[in-house]
Amino acid sequence: MKTIHKLFLGLCLPATLGPLLGIVVTNTDQSIKFTSKSNSINKNNQNKELALLRDNLMNEAKVDEPLSFEKRFENFKNKYSDIHSLNNSVFSLHDVYDLLGGFKQSLTTFFDEVIAQQQKIKDADKIFPSTKDNPPKEENPNVLDTLANYQGAGFFPSLGKNGFNLPEAVFQNFTDFRINDYKIKNFNVDLVSENDIIKHDKVRYAFEVKFNIALVLSINKSNVDFDFDFILKTDNFSDIENFNEIFNRKPALQFRFYTKINVHKLSFNGSDSTYIANILLQDQFNLLEIDLNKSIYALDLENAKERFDKEFVQPLYQKRREAKLAWEEEQRRIAEEQRRQEEERARILKELKEKAEKDKRVKEAQNNLQKALGNLDTFFNFFSSGQDRVLLGFDPNKYNVQTREGLFKALQISYSNFKTWTFYISLLGWKEGSVKLLKKPIWNALRDDKAFQYAFGLGPNTSEQQLGRVTLPGYGYEGIRMSDWLRWALGYYTSFTLSPPKNVEANLIGDANDKKHIWISPHTFKLNREYGDGERFKGKAYRFKLSISFELEGHLTAHWWTIAFRGSIPGSWSGKLRVTHEFDGDVPYYRLHTTPPQYRLTDDMKLLFVPHSIQRVTAVGNESINGLLRSQNLHNLERQSYEATAPIDLISYMLYAISDKKPPQK
């Protein structure tokens, strides 16, 4: 059950504190009950001599209370000046009591040294700061663990089993363990007693070391406050013989302790886990084999300091010095490169200055071109007359802007100078070309329009169905996108007619100065940059909103014999249909198997463009046909297939839009 408690504690506390609980739980489930102090001694005990010695010791401790534990430990060291004298002596109760008084001094010395060596590691940043978020162990060692390991088996305190009992599998994974501060309070050594649980007239004794320690830690760059009482208790003894077996065995100062922890505060970044820690830590003990010679009596950190300096500090300092030299060399290289670049820049500036007069006229021509890209009339006029077009590379003896070759060249020039404005003027051409073709009074008139035939590459024998599908939006009834079944059903089950488009309207929001509404990526479109699978690719290729709408007057009468199977087709309808085409740059995601975003001038003199398109068809007035429209999704039909999203050629629309314009007078 205690094992389950430990597991539950690790699950309940924050991720960083789970490993820290190794400090306060043991690696064994053996329950060892602590003794309670007793001020009364059964005078009929068989260990009267030991009881008397104990009373004398405690009375003496009370009388000599001003005598600090540090002083008592100093007296012990004066009495036993070297390890030889220790191994050839027999300790008394007073000796052990005085020896254990050195725990606080040794802990203080050890923690101070840990903090000092931590500072040495930190001082490496003064040589050259580290740029690593998680430096390797050799550059950021766990100093407490390292110094403790240097002392060898039996040294207290360490992080592992012979110390705070933090399991190796846990503390070895700490990438940043640091003691920022500590305080040791309420230090006390006592000789406690309890009645034997079997022979009630017999008293057992044990030495108990108790103190409070408040640690301010940094673990994996997170602040941890750990305030707890720590109790170390020796084996019990009931007489002088037991005492000698425990404390006078050789080699000297090899004692066994049982430890217990009472947590006052355990918090991680302000998250308090004290209560649950104490609930689950009750009855948890740890057995320590402590070598008090190396831990207290002959604590010597000089060798550890020298070894740590050799293995960690000096190599780290050398690394930082080398890093600093490399950085300085890189700075010199950068400075030299900057000097070379400055010289090159000066040369270029000189050349630019020499040709500034020549370029001034070109710049003026570019400014005039940008202004001309504001509408189709000024665009047409710019490339139909004047010298500005010549300065920018448009040869009027070779090109005519009202031909495909000429318009393609004009768009190449404008695209190389003003990509967004070229995008805008091509959208205007699409808009005005669409309005122009939709306003034709009858489909035959559109088919027979020579300018339309030239712009879209059609012949005089083009059918109404072909004509309706060659443009986006398409002309008339055949230009409405619907399923083949619905088009067949309307022709087979009903008598259905629709007029040519009327009340044509078009709206393009914003212009090239308004990047919120008109914008195109400066890059060539690539998968996983301008387009791809997911919401984050919306608007990455281009942004615009264009709507084109018109009305179709119509009549529908279903044949009488179709009533049983014509579905949502109404028996009769007469009224208007409002057809709206909404276009924007939110091309459907790549996973929908649509043509990805595209805006490019091709070798066959086309400007291919893929818009996102939604067709909405709704009834105006008589809404009895709306059920059919909704059932076929014609009220909100989004183009989502390779065929439906094939690129359109914006040059075709622009050619048709400017086909009847006249050049300005010279």
UniProtKB/Swiss-Prot annotation:
Family assignment from sequence similarity: Belongs to the MG032/MG096/MG288 family.
Protein name: Uncharacterized protein MG032
